[in-house]
Amino acid sequence: MNQHSHKDYETVRIAVVRARWHADIVDQCVSAFEAEMADIGGDRFAVDVFDVPGAYEIPLHARTLAETGRYGAVLGTAFVVNGGIYRHEFVASAVIDGMMNVQLSTGVPVLSAVLTPHNYHDSAEHHRFFFEHFTVKGKEAARACVEILAAREKIAA
């Protein structure tokens, strides 16, 4: 009896780059993403998680990962809020633009769960809302990841 498991597919590695600001909220996205990828694909997908200090570091890290050739896609996730010192829209825009540039220059899909709310106050109500919202966004990102990988596979066939 053959005790070796043989798959008729290759495992696709997905990199997740998460910012550590508001880690408890951002981690909900990552957990939901991992769970949804497992639900959708079983062992077809392997998710590797990488931490960066803040959102601003995501594009460079995503590019470094994409250029290795080991990843079929990269997800960047962060929670960019108004800290009262500088305009958070500037940071969010720079991060999203950087992520777009990474996918266009490397050919590796880079998905975004980098969210910047219009208003965020460090209150129990806002924390609870975004804690739950990042769970939804993680599931959505997983479905988008599977869809874009399937679309690219179809193009390559």
From Swiss-Prot:
It catalyses: (2S)-2-hydroxy-3-oxobutyl phosphate + 5-amino-6-(D-ribitylamino)uracil = 6,7-dimethyl-8-(1-D-ribityl)lumazine + phosphate + 2 H2O + H(+). 5-amino-6-(D-ribitylamino)uracil binds at residues 21, 55-57, 79-81, 112. This is 6,7-dimethyl-8-ribityllumazine synthase 2. InterPro entries: LS (IPR034964), LS/RS (IPR002180), LS/RS_sf (IPR036467). Catalyzes the formation of 6,7-dimethyl-8-ribityllumazine by condensation of 5-amino-6-(D-ribitylamino)uracil with 3,4-dihydroxy-2-butanone 4-phosphate. This is the penultimate step in the biosynthesis of riboflavin. It holds the Pfam family DMRL_synthase. GO terms for biological process: riboflavin biosynthetic process. One of its GO terms (cellular component) is riboflavin synthase complex. It comes from the Bacteria. The gene is ribH2. The keyword Transferase applies. It is an enzyme of class 2 (transferase). (2S)-2-hydroxy-3-oxobutyl phosphate binds at residue 126. One of its GO terms (molecular function) is 6,7-dimethyl-8-ribityllumazine synthase activity.
